Design a protein with these regions (language model features):
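N-terminal, post-signal peptide beta-strand-biased segments of exported outer-membrane/organellar beta-barrel
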Residues: 19-86
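Repeated loop/turn-to-beta-strand initiation elements of outer-membrane beta-barrel proteins
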Residues: 56-57, 77-82, 124-131, 166-176, ...
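Residues that define the transmembrane beta-barrel architecture of outer-membrane proteins
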Residues: 64-68, 108-116, 148-158, 205-214, ...
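Outer-membrane beta-barrel "beta-signal"
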Residues: 389-393, 397, 403, 414-428
Length: 428
């Protein structure tokens, strides 16, 4: 039972993670451990798109070993239009052929990840449509068997913001997002025995988990951006699974077919995420920054009842309910120093702090319930050093680069193994 719960929970966690749709990040933001923003971070953000200063258009591209990013924004009188794409353009399909003395197998894999966002700005406010598509399909065909696994994940979201509530010392920027995610997983197999007139067995498993999410957030800004500026953020996210029941398994052996259905799967999670960020202009050439972010996540999962189609029991058995609580946090320290008026070095230190986790399992036993609670602190600590530069080639274009160095004995591998990222901005 616990194993089933963990499997269901892990599938749902994949879906939850995907609802926080990838936000474009500049090499400056990455190089300073998430502390210093620039135009590439702001042009598709409903809170800050108005801070991008250009008269005609703004263009941005970022290339790394794993993905490509393209961004473009333009003003049409009082309308602001921003577009953004990120995808794994160079990671496509692969195939492997294996031959043995009595069989031959061919395996093919097709996978890809793509993000596309569209932002409309008007009268200081903004609407942003975000989409995410991920596929990971694999097929293996051999002399006596076929397996076909298909995994797809789609996310659709709408974010509204841009307006602010100001006072003498405080500026409040509220914003909200609603989203819907679809996770489909199917596994088909066909197996034939290695004898004449053998029995053929086929199985078809499926899992469809849909997640509806609502996020309410606000930034509380104070200070002067020319000296000391700080932002306290607070966000609340509610996720719930809908439409996650139905036929999940079908097996055919010879002339006999078995179909299994599921009912009662439930999933709910609440996330509270406070954060704090500051920027300090220590001198004309030196800027210091820092941030800390905390996530408090409470998730309740019930795996539901399964039964053979046509044999649904009059009374469903009582279900086990798993509730997990996780508190995670990370911090970043950043610095930008101008060596020349048009060239600045970025340095950042990023750290993932120990996390607290607790699991409560309520299992029905006869007419009573058994409750088990386990909790503890994961004392593991990880950190990375980040560095890069910004080169303003002229008043219209700039080159932005960073690399990530894990603070482990194999840090050299992290530099040479694909962590280098190059960005290019142009505005006119």
């Amino acid at each position: 039972m616990n194993k089933i719960l963990k499997i269901v929970a892990s599938l749902l966690l994949v879906l939850v993670a995907s609802t926080f749709v990838f936000a474009q990040t500049s090499s400056t933001l990455n190089g300073t451990a998430g502390t210093l923003r620039d135009d590439a971070d702001n042009f598709m953000d409903v809170r800050y798109y108005n801070e991008v200063d250009f008269s005609n258009f703004f263009a941005w591209t970022n290339l790394s070993a794993s993905s490509a990013t393209l961004g473009y924004a333009k003003k049409f009188d009082n309308l602001y239009l921003g577009t953004y794409y990120n995808g794994s353009l160079w990671n496509g399909s692969s195939s492997t052929k294996t031959t043995t003395s009595d069989s031959t197998s061919l395996s093919k894999t097709v996978k890809g990840t793509h993000y596309f966002d569209l932002l409309f700005g008007f009268s200081g406010m903004a609407l942003k449509f975000d989409t995410y598509f991920n596929t990971n399909n694999s097929v293996t065909e051999s002399t006596y068997s076929i397996t076909d696994n298909k995994n797809s994940n789609s996310v659709f979201g709408l974010t509204f913001g841009g307006f602010s509530i100001s006072s003498e010392k405080l500026n409040i920027k509220p914003w909200a997002r609603v989203g819907f995610s679809i996770l489909d997983q199917t596994a088909y197999s066909k197996v034939e025995e290695k004898i004449l007139d053998s029995t053929i067995t086929t199985t078809d498993k499926s899992s469809n988990l849909n997640l509806f999410s609502v996020k309410l957030a606000a930034d509380f800004e104070s200070g002067d951006k020319d000296s000391f500026f700080s932002v306290f953020g607070l966000a609340y996210t509610l996720n719930t699974a809908v439409g996650a029941n139905g036929i999940i398994y079908e097996s055919v052996t010879g002339m006999e077919t078995t179909t299994v259905e599921r009912e009662g799967l439930k999933y709910n999670t609440s996330i509270i995420a406070p954060s704090y960020r500051f920027e300090y202009n220590a001198s004309e050439n030196l800027k210091l920054a820092g941030r800390v972010r905390v996530n408090a996540d409470i998730t309740t999962v019930c795996e539901g009842n399964t039964y053979i189609t046509g044999a649904k029991p009059e009374e469903m058995e009582a279900l086990t309910v798993l509730t997990t609580t996780e508190i995670t946090s990370n911090l970043g320290l950043g610095m930008q120093y101008k060596l020349k008026p048009n060239f600045a070095m970025n340095v950042g230190l990023y750290a993932v702090l120990p996390e607290f986790n607790s699991t409560k399992t309520v299992t029905p036993v006869g007419d009573s319930k058994s409750t088990t609670v386990t909790s503890g602190v994961d004392t593991s600590f990880s950190s990375s050093l980040r560095t890069g530069f910004v080169w303003d080639i002229n008043e219209n274009c700039a080159l932005d680069a960073y690399t990530n160095i894990g603070l482990t004995p194999s840090f050299l591998d992290s530099v040479l193994g694909g962590s280098l990222s190059l960005g290019f901005k142009y505005k006119k």
